[in-house]
Amino acid sequence: MAVDSFSKYGIDVDLSVFDTAADKNVTHKLLQENDFTAYDLLIGPLTSNAFDFVIKSIPDEVKVVSPLSKTKLENINIIHTIPEDHLLFNKMISYIEKDTIRSEKFIIADSYNKEVSDKIKRIFPNAHQFFSEINDSGIDTRTMVYDSLDSTFVKGRNLVFLETKDQGFVSNISSILNSFVNDTIEIILTTTNKNRAFEGTNISNYYMSNLNFHYPSINRSISTYKDNNFVKKYSSRYNDYPSKYAIRGHDLTLDLLIRLRCGELDSNNLNLVQSEYIENRFRYVKDKDGIYRNNSAYIMKFQNLELIQIE
């Protein structure tokens, strides 16, 4: 459907779709039977293993786009569309540093995330550090109890970093923090790495909303874009709202087609242009090794049970 959007500008796109069937043998056969040097751009495969297999078999002159997954490969023909974790970390930290409202800062982490906790502590030296409980056997329980944080928070604004990849710990901490919120104590929960632990079925949306959960994200929410033409067409065709993956596919493909048409994929000016679509924004920067990476992201906030873009 991104190609349909592009065609309204009077520009034809010759599109070929190849189904790897998530099978290495099928992928190998496709690579053997097709001349991919005839294409301006190759988007995918979607999974990291399949993508890595393809990139090792494709000539360097073919630009290959990693749409949904990250790859550790550093080939100069790869266009990395997923922002790196360190960029998301820096964006969240920068947002907090620019905040002019005074707040006490706290860092809560499990032992597996001590390194990032210490990193945040170096940036905010006055922040108070807390770690999950270690049992008598020396095992991290990835839990804390109410008494561990009792009398910790001050009247006014309290900003709490939660650094973990454990869903149970997120559930545990968000519940405890929520119990401290009252008319005089405000608690804002944030993280520098919103992973799947923050999205599990055990996570209370009410708690996260009540804590005004802030986080960095590669995409924004569709909730305010239901009147978008693409969303309407997709809903009409498939009788459902598009998933974040379908929207990313649309945004990413449309952006690359426009950049390809303008010659930006072969231009040093590529890093000067930021574009934004339904849920995604793109600003590619060529690093010291000549590799293109997307350096655009969002800051989102959970408020009144809705996701709001704040930066």
Predicted features and spans:
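Extracellular glycoside hydrolase catalytic/binding regions
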Residues: 63-67, 72-90
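Signal peptide-proximal N-terminal region
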Residues: 1-15
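An alpha-beta-alpha
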Residues: 84-135
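Extracellular/periplasmic periplasmic-binding protein-like sensory domains
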Residues: 173-248
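Periplasmic-binding protein-like
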Residues: 35-47, 65-67, 104-110, 154-173, ...
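Beta-alpha junction/loop-to-helix N-cap segments that form part of ligand/metal-binding clefts
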Residues: 11-72
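A short, well-structured beta->alpha microelement
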Residues: 12-31, 127-154
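Segments of small-molecule ligand-sensing domains
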Residues: 239-243, 257-307
